[in-house]
Amino acid sequence: LKAKEIIYMLVDAVSKNGNLLLNVGPRADGSIQEEQKKPLLETGKWLKINGEAIYETTYWEKQEAETEKGQQVRFTKKGNQLYAVILDEELDASVVIKDLEIPSGATVTLLGEAGELSWEQKGENLSVKIPENIQKQYAYTLKISC
């Protein structure tokens, strides 16, 4: 499996109150083969940035959605925080998540990037402006604080 596939499976499972079990076959000396180690290390790098959307979270009332562009989105929550993980390596300057309404006083941030993001409610859809030159990731997490 590639890191992208592991991340997408993990996010999908957690958004549905599940977990992910990976079978990694070590060598006789306990070391892990390079072709298995590399995707695990890349997944770990992604989790360093986006782990708060995974660890100690639970499912939300809506498990999945998509953007107007057709990108898949998965949701998790922790307390007053809602996490929307966009399962795509590319983000446009504006991301519109269909059928997602948030309270008017909410703040939206992108994990791994500094500062709040501009957003507006367009009917039942949430439109979020994405900053330029963001760090490349396999998936991006919007943190919505209500």
Role assignments for model-derived ranges:
Residues L1-C146:
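Mature catalytic domains of secreted/periplasmic carbohydrate-active enzymes
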